[in-house]
UniProtKB/Swiss-Prot annotation:
<dbReference type="InterPro" id="IPR029062">
    <property type="entry name" value="Class_I_gatase-like"/>
</dbReference>
<keyword id="KW-0067">ATP-binding</keyword>
<protein>
    <recommendedName>
        <fullName>GMP synthase [glutamine-hydrolyzing]</fullName>
        <ecNumber>6.3.5.2</ecNumber>
    </recommendedName>
</protein>
<keyword id="KW-0332">GMP biosynthesis</keyword>
<feature type="binding site">
    <location>
        <begin position="232"/>
        <end position="238"/>
    </location>
    <ligand>
        <name>ATP</name>
    </ligand>
</feature>
<dbReference type="InterPro" id="IPR025777">
    <property type="entry name" value="GMPS_ATP_PPase_dom"/>
</dbReference>
<keyword id="KW-0547">Nucleotide-binding</keyword>
<dbReference type="Pfam" id="PF00958">
    <property type="entry name" value="GMP_synt_C"/>
</dbReference>
<keyword id="KW-0315">Glutamine amidotransferase</keyword>
<dbReference type="InterPro" id="IPR022955">
    <property type="entry name" value="GMP_synthase"/>
</dbReference>
<feature type="domain" description="GMPS ATP-PPase">
    <location>
        <begin position="205"/>
        <end position="403"/>
    </location>
</feature>
<comment type="subunit">
    <text>Homodimer.</text>
</comment>
<comment type="function">
    <text>Catalyzes the synthesis of GMP from XMP.</text>
</comment>
<feature type="active site">
    <location>
        <position position="180"/>
    </location>
</feature>
<keyword id="KW-0658">Purine biosynthesis</keyword>
<dbReference type="Pfam" id="PF00117">
    <property type="entry name" value="GATase"/>
</dbReference>
<dbReference type="GO" id="GO:0005524">
    <property type="term" value="F:ATP binding"/>
</dbReference>
Length: 528
């Protein structure tokens, strides 16, 4: 399988070196919100490689390690002599201090976790427009005991004397808090200060610029070859369809494989929307029985994902021979998909970065090794909010742009355990009620995802003076900005009551509705 080459090839203005923080990608997203392109690289990226990339700034992420630990992850010390501005965040600040001759130790007093008011001592370029007393998010058990030569304090908190520091002449900055999280009220002001005032970046990472570059890169990669797109009807594949149509016109063929795991009425909606309303021809393939047959007796969620992903590509290969030839397979893979399928962390025993696979993503984890297509994935460096902006700019209607995310394997991973036709019918009806009621309440666009999950157990109930023994449905509603982290949505009680009453009365085989109040982390948004 060839590696995708349709990422944007522009050099990043800001490079984030990742030391294992759960917020590393969030830092990248915040920088991009300032219309400055950023990427996340491993902490071991050499100073020479960074010199060749020539970013205007470097950000060192936080991380779970202690800089004085035996196998602590370290950056190339040559970074300090590149003449490139550096901002260290939490662990990144401590690493900067230690490598440049300062002292970092375990906090002797009270460790600082959560919100803390920041007292600004020196409103330099980094802290311009950062209000004195503004709330910042702390999460550290170590602290700076002595600053390196040439460094000065910029701000402090009640428990952290060196909450923000700098070597002003060398443009080396460190903050002990996390400006990237929403809890830091002036965090974005600080990030903008670093990006614009310290680094001198230009705000040129715009939707229009991305579209122009992506179109040019797709044309360069594909040439006069034909491209086959797996169209699902979600915002990702729909945006991709519009982008590819703009780039290569009739060289694009969209194929919708109905694997039987879509939500109620979606196959019909999809065909009408693209084929008739927007004149983008879609080949409809009914493969419902083929997919359900492959999942017979399968209960392991990872195996289900891989079977669906493999079978999906097999159908593509077969249909491409009938409709083709095609050289490229287009996929709507996004940045969080890649991260979640092969996340990285630091092994505290060895200091090495290791893969921590949470779950295979349908686009990137279930592909067979003998894939006959080359991949074109022009969206794989975008976050979901960026994809929505691209979709709007390309003319995609709000009905599609603001649809809730839906996993590639569909309802098959919202049915825990074995997937059957009976369970699919049950879940479709329950899921439709959830979405109908949330839309009726005017909350659909305030929620990241809202859906139903069918559990592989039965519970006792009483309906019409008779004992029932039926499946429970889980109501899963979460709020998020990008899907990387999420909190459970606080729905009104009367809305939850309406949803529950409708499901147990209208959906055959269900006698109980429960609410999932787990955030991500520790849970994931989907149950499988």
């Amino acid at each position: 399988m060839s590696q995708p080459s349709s990422d944007t090839q522009r050099q990043p203005a800001i490079v984030i070196l990742d030391f294992g923080s759960q917020y590393s990608e969030l830092i990248a997203r915040r920088v991009r919100e300032t219309e400055v392109f950023s990427v996340v690289l491993g902490y071991s990226t050499s100073a020479e490689e960074l010199r060749r990339m020539a970013p205007k700034g470097i950000i060192l992420s936080g991380g779970p390690s202690s800089v004085y630990a035996e196998h602590a992850p370290l950056c190339d010390p040559g970074i300090w002599d590149l003449g490139i501005p550096v901002l260290g965040v939490c662990y990144g600040m401590q690493l900067m201090v230690q490598q440049l001759g300062g002292v970092v130790e375990a906090a002797t007093g009270k460790a600082e976790y959560g919100k803390a008011p920041l007292e600004v001592d020196d409103p330099t370029d980094l802290l311009t427009n950062v209000d004195n007393g503004s709330t910042m998010w702390m999460s550290h058990g170590d602290s700076v005991k002595a600053l390196p030569e040439g460094f000065v304090r910029l701000a402090h908190t009640a428990n952290t004397p060196e909450a923000a520091v700098a070597h002003l002449q060398r443009k080396l900055y460190g903050v002990q808090f996390h400006p990237e999280v929403v809890h830091s009220t002036c965090g974005m002001a600080l990030i903008r200060n670093f990006v614009y005032h310290v680094c001198g970046c230009d705000p040129d990472w715009t939707t229009a610029a991305f579209i122009d570059e992506a179109v040019a890169l797709v044309r360069e990669q594909v040439g006069d070859k034909r491209v086959l797109l797996a169209l699902s009807g979600g915002v990702d594949s729909s945006t991709l369809a519009f982008l590819l149509k703009k780039a290569i016109g009739d060289q694009l063929t969209c194929m919708f494989i109905d694997q039987g795991f879509m939500r109620k009425g979606e196959p019909e909606f999809l065909m009408d929307f693209f084929d008739r309303k927007f004149n983008i021809h879609v080949e409809y393939i009914n493969a419902r029985q083929r997919f359900i047959g492959k999942l017979e007796g399968i209960t392991d969620p990872e195996e289900k994902r891989k079977i669906i992903g493999t079978e999906f590509i097999r159908v593509f290969e077969e249909e491409s021979k009938r409709l083709g030839p095609f050289d490229y397979l287009a996929q709507g893979t996004l940045y969080p998909d890649v991260i979640e399928s092969a996340g990285t962390n630091v092994d505290p025993k060895t200091g090495e970065r290791v893969a921590v696979k949470i779950k295979s993503h349908h686009n990137v984890g279930g592909l067979p090794k003998d894939l006959q297509f080359k991949l074109v994935e022009p969206l794989r460096k975008l976050f979901k909010d960026e994809v929505r902006k691209v979709g709007r700019s390309l003319g995609l209607p709000e009905e599609i742009v603001r649809r809730h995310p839906f996993p590639g394997p569909g309802l098959a991973i919202r049915i825990l355990g074995e997937v059957t036709d009976e369970k699919l019918d049950c879940l479709r009806d329950a899921d439709l009620i959830v979405r109908q009621e949330i839309k009726e309440a005017g909350l659909y666009h305030d929620i990241w995802q809202a859906f139903a999950v069918l559990l592989p157990v039965r519970s006792v109930g009483v309906m019409g003076d008779k004992r029932t023994y039926a499946w429970p449905i889980v109501l899963r509603c979460v709020s998020s900005e990008d899907g990387m982290t999420a909190d459970w949505s606080r729905l009104p009680y009367d809305l939850m009551e309406t949803i529950s009453n409708r499901i147990v009365n209208e959906v055959k085989g269900v006698n109980r509705v429960v609410l999932d109040i787990t955030s991500k982390p520790p849970g994931t948004i989907e149950w499988e």
